[in-house]
């Protein structure tokens, strides 16, 4: 089996469907004997350029190990799902399991609530 990195972008109005989509796609991979090494839901992010007059999209990253037939089926599902506005499937040399730089940056960034609480404590 080969290793793949899959990124797909979902229409921002369809963000509530993302958990179901992830479950459906991961289920198809696991049912065919594949494994999922990394799954990250990056949430809504600003696009670098407008796509179909959209400026934001919901991003999902997966690193999987699967047969080519599973990847073909997944690509076919992306193509016929109107909620998926873009997708990219790249073959990689080995399994990637560590957190992506995007997720690391998000975890390192202080949350708004934490910053607000610290500001209130400093004001007292």
From Swiss-Prot:
InterPro entries given in the database record: Ribosomal_bS6 (IPR000529), Ribosomal_bS6_sf (IPR035980), Ribosomal_S6_plastid/chlpt (IPR020814), Transl_elong_EF1B/ribsomal_bS6 (IPR014717)
Name of a matching Pfam family: Ribosomal_S6
Keyword Ribosomal protein: yes
Any coiled-coil regions, as ranges: none
SUPFAM superfamilies xrefs: Ribosomal protein S6
GO molecular function: small ribosomal subunit rRNA binding; structural constituent of ribosome
GO cellular component: cytosolic small ribosomal subunit
Composition skew (Basic and acidic residues), residue ranges: 104-115
Sequence segments annotated as region (Disordered): 98-124
Keywords from the named record: Ribonucleoprotein, Ribosomal protein, RNA-binding, rRNA-binding
Any one of the GO BP annotations: translation
Physiological role: Binds together with bS18 to 16S ribosomal RNA.
NCBIfam families the UniProt entry points to: S6 (TIGR00166)
Recorded family membership: Belongs to the bacterial ribosomal protein bS6 family.
Name of the molecule in the record: Small ribosomal subunit protein bS6
Species for this entry: Tolumonas auensis (strain DSM 9187 / NBRC 110442 / TA 4)
């Amino acid at each position: 089996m080969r290793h793949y990195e899959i990124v797909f972008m979902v229409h921002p109005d369809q963000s509530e469907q993302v958990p179901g989509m992830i479950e459906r796609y991961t289920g198809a991979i696991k049912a065919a004997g594949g494994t999922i090494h990394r799954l990250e839901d990056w949430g809504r992010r600003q696009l670098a350029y407008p796509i179909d007059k959209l400026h934001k999209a919901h991003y999902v990253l997966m690193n999987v190990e699967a047969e080519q037939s599973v990847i073909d089926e997944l690509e076919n599902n992306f193509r016929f799902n109107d909620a998926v506005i873009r997708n990219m499937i790249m073959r990689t040399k080995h399994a990637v399991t560590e957190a992506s730089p995007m997720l690391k940056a998000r975890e390192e960034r202080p949350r708004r609530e934490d910053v607000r609480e610290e500001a209130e404590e400093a004001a007292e």
